[in-house]
Amino acid sequence: IFKNIENSANGTESESDLKGLFDDIDVNSNKLGSTVAKRNEKLVKLLNGVGEMNLGDVKDHSIDAFGDAYEYLMTMYASNAGKSGGEFFTPADVSELLTRLGTVGKTEINKVYDPACGSGSLLLKAEKVLGKEAIRNGFYGQEINITTYNLCRINMFLHDVGFDKFNIACEDTLI
């Protein structure tokens, strides 16, 4: 199913933005179940549960249920991961402080760049503090870890940042 989601963008402008997005999802993991049937059952329950969620008026962007839920889960995972969680997640308070310091007196900025963007929490905090329309040319980031790079891209999509408004690269910032 994840490959079908990626393939749905083939031939469109967003093709490269979705390519490899779910590469790190291991649907054969024993953590999902000891047999293929049990793993499939859990995945079906998950996808059906997401499909049945009442997300309110998503089209008017009055809520950000997926994005907020994702951030919450990332926060919980990072805090449980201890020191290693800092490799991919900047705490919300730190992100907000950095954003406010970097944008003092500004109501609009050209772009936001994070050279070690992790899951994208700092990039998205700039959007929350200034507003999506105040960031004219989008969000840019680099992340060396492929798994974290994909987390960032998923995070952008879940926060309704269009594929044409962000450019996240899986690269070493220092090279």
Question: Where do the PLM segments sit?
Answer:
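Non-catalytic, mostly N-terminal accessory regions of nucleic-acid modification and defense proteins
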Residues: I1-K106, D164-I175
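Conserved S-adenosyl-L-methionine
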Residues: S84-I175
